[in-house]
A protein has these predicted regions:
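Long, highly hydrophobic alpha-helical transmembrane signal-anchor segments
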Residues: 1-14, 66-88
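N-terminal juxtamembrane cytosolic/stromal segments of multi-pass membrane proteins
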Residues: 1-59
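Alpha-helical transmembrane segments
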Residues: 7-23, 90-103, 160-165
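Hydrophobic alpha-helical transmembrane segments of multi-pass integral membrane proteins
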Residues: 17, 60-78, 101-102, 106, ...
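Membrane-water interface at transmembrane helix exits
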Residues: 25, 34, 38, 76-80, ...
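Membrane-interface helix-boundary motifs at transmembrane edges
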Residues: 48-57, 82-89, 120-128, 155-157, ...
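Alpha-helical transmembrane segments with an aromatic anchor "belt"
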Residues: 84-151
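Terminal transmembrane helical module of multi-pass membrane proteins
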Residues: 143-218
Length: 218
């Protein structure tokens, strides 16, 4: 089994780097960070910071780096469950990190472009801010999950699958909150919404999975 020979060094580096990013965020943006921790529990964070729409702020950028970092670590962990032979190396790590970052930033750019084309810049900016906040929250959750899976449960199959359910639940809950906040806009453009889900949410994930699963570089 691949999980039996996986070195934990990369997870130690990921955990320490991620903790440093979170610590820097909390130190520089204490009030913002504390409000952000209640993102799923209530709507205070969105109400307070939604009008600013600063999805390219330093605060979000640091949390975005943390998200990409922990996503790569989680992909390594999940690959052990699927027995996919992902090579653990700096090169592979950087490729995966770049793919995830490029995918997410690319989606943001496309959404901004669509907002400009259809003259819904403000609504699209709000949608992007909500989605980025939701994803960055997932990044925070993945930090303890990854550490527990590696250092406590030692890549246990049940623990990995349970963690996947938890992560998916958080993502779905964040999507529901986003849909509720933009329900009028969605209902008024329902066909475009379905097209958006298929092309910008589901489609790229399938392509990314096939690319990673079939790549000779990973």
């Amino acid at each position: 089994m691949i999980r039996e020979v996986i070195s934990s060094d990369i997870y130690v580096v990921c955990s320490i780097t991620s903790l440093l990013l979170v610590l820097i965020t909390k130190t520089l943006y204490k009030r913002n960070f504390l409000d952000f921790l209640s993102f799923l529990g209530n709507s205070n964070y969105l109400k307070i910071y939604l009008n600013q729409n600063k999805f390219f702020s330093v605060f979000n950028l640091i949390l975005f780096l943390n998200l990409c970092l922990n996503c790569v670590a989680f992909m390594y962990i999940y690959s052990s469950e699927l027995e996919i032979n992902l090579i653990i190396s700096i090169k592979t790590f950087l490729i995966l990190f770049g793919l995830i970052g490029f995918y997410l930033i690319g989606k943001i750019c496309i959404k901004l472009f669509l907002g400009y084309i259809f003259n819904i810049d403000k609504q699209m900016s709000i949608l992007i801010f909500q989605q980025i906040s939701s994803l960055n929250f997932v990044g925070l959750i993945l930090l303890p999950i990854n550490s527990i899976l590696v250092f406590t449960f030692k890549f246990d199959s049940v623990a990995i699958n349970t963690s996947i359910v938890v992560v998916i639940s958080v993502v779905v809950f964040g999507m529901i909150k986003t849909i509720q906040s933009n329900l009028k806009l969605i209902l008024a453009n329902f066909l475009y919404f379905i097209l958006y889900i298929c092309t910008l949410e589901i489609g790229p994930l399938v392509v990314l999975y096939d690319l990673i699963n079939g790549s000779n570089y990973l």
